[in-house]
């Protein structure tokens, strides 16, 4: 059974507190947009698709449980202000801004309808937010299917048999509404009997790989090994052939129009390693992560976080034998007074990316080495979902 990081029913929302993983599974109630803003900012919930869903549903819960004005315009203004506020919780993630924009347009349309009142505007918003939750899971399953098929058909390792894959950060059920993007590809390979082994990097400094991805892999009984970020090159060189490593698959927080991809810090390094060692480097993300208005990675704003995330580590006490969940300790691991630079993301140039896996297929570069990401939006509503979209 796949992990459930978001529990929702109309008027109620709970999120799995990811700061307490992998040692404790505790859910936090989210009652309002303010609760969601803090949960996103504090990274109790994280992952570009997940934070968009949590933000949308939090406002739906708030609207469902409050006494609203009867005037449609007043409710529209309230929703717009809350959406603008929620977007400030994680500016790098385009999914959040994209979801907010779609919900705002739906709200404006509902408010402008003949006979509209506060209740009808609320219903339009809540129904749209709930649909986003359902659609995200379906899209992730499609991403997994397309990615797995592409890897088996387009890699030397895939032609030999079950493949091994490396991944970075957390892109599974904990980062989405369910199933996952990059980790969803690994799940799909495993379900098809095509996965030999998964390797996940710890993802310093927030350790999403060791805390979250490793947790999901163990939970789903997928054969996997955890490595530190600095071991990736050695893994590809020393065990790439014996493990039949086909490539590295990662998620994305924002994909620019030219294919430049902002993702968790350390992604760029892995792309360089993949190129050097001749394995595929793939980005898995829903179309909502693709931002055609952002021309290149140079236009992406990179969030910088507190240096304490680098110099301090936090977790339950362990005496070398047993784990004491009742005692949470913070440990200093760096010289006192040292300066710290802590960008949360980096940008991987499109030239290092072999394919971008979406819910409608895998986008490849044309003969000139150029991604045409507008093609994935032309596939909107198409009954055919190709495994490859390329050379267009």
Swiss-Prot record:
The keyword Isomerase applies. It is an enzyme of class 5 (isomerase). It is found in: Cytoplasm; Nucleus. InterPro entries: IF-2B-related, IF-M1Pi, IF_2B-like_C, Initiation_fac_2B_a/b/d, M1Pi_N, NagB/RpiA_transferase-like. The record marks 169 as: Transition state stabilizer. This is Methylthioribose-1-phosphate isomerase. The keyword Amino-acid biosynthesis applies. It comes from Pyrenophora tritici-repentis (strain Pt-1C-BFP). GO terms for biological process: L-methionine salvage from methylthioadenosine. Pathway: Amino-acid biosynthesis; L-methionine biosynthesis via salvage pathway; L-methionine from S-methyl-5-thio-alpha-D-ribose 1-phosphate: step 1/6. It catalyses: 5-(methylsulfanyl)-alpha-D-ribose 1-phosphate = 5-(methylsulfanyl)-D-ribulose 1-phosphate. The active site is at residue 253. Catalyzes the interconversion of methylthioribose-1-phosphate (MTR-1-P) into methylthioribulose-1-phosphate (MTRu-1-P). One of its GO terms (cellular component) is cytoplasm. GO terms for molecular function: S-methyl-5-thioribose-1-phosphate isomerase activity.
